Amino acid sequence: MLKNLSHVNIWVHDQDEALAFYTDKLGLELRDDVTLPEMGNFRWLTVGLPGQPDAALTLMAIPGPPVFDADTRKKIEELTAKGAAGGLFFSTDDCRATYEELKSRGVDFTEEPSERPYGIDAAFRDPSGNHIRMVQTT
């Protein structure tokens, strides 16, 4: 049987920029940063929340040929930039306080904290355009 969800991948336009955003601004920690020469210098870059060692977010560069042809790569870049290539949800104990903290670190929010039927949430994007929500459930 399946045991845990260990990795979630998101597309990023610039892995170094994404790493700085997720670690410096959001407070995640670096887990892996490995270059694999046998795979065309593919960079395996993961971050995760402190205290959750079994779950990681993989910051994936959008590959070109032979993985994706140029047109497919361009479409993925465009969808990611629009926030339409998936998204992330983080939970928080205090959405409003976390909003203020992240805003002070330079996170650009697309939605301020607001009351929802399930709790309080707010939204922002990473530098690549990925849509991220943080939720305080009630």
Mark where each language-model region is.
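Vicinal oxygen chelate
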Residues: 1, 9-10, 34-35, 43-48, ...
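A short, polar/proline- and glycine-enriched secondary-structure boundary/capping micro-motif
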Residues: 67-72
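Short, P/G- and charge-enriched loop/turn segments at secondary-structure junctions
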Residues: 73-78
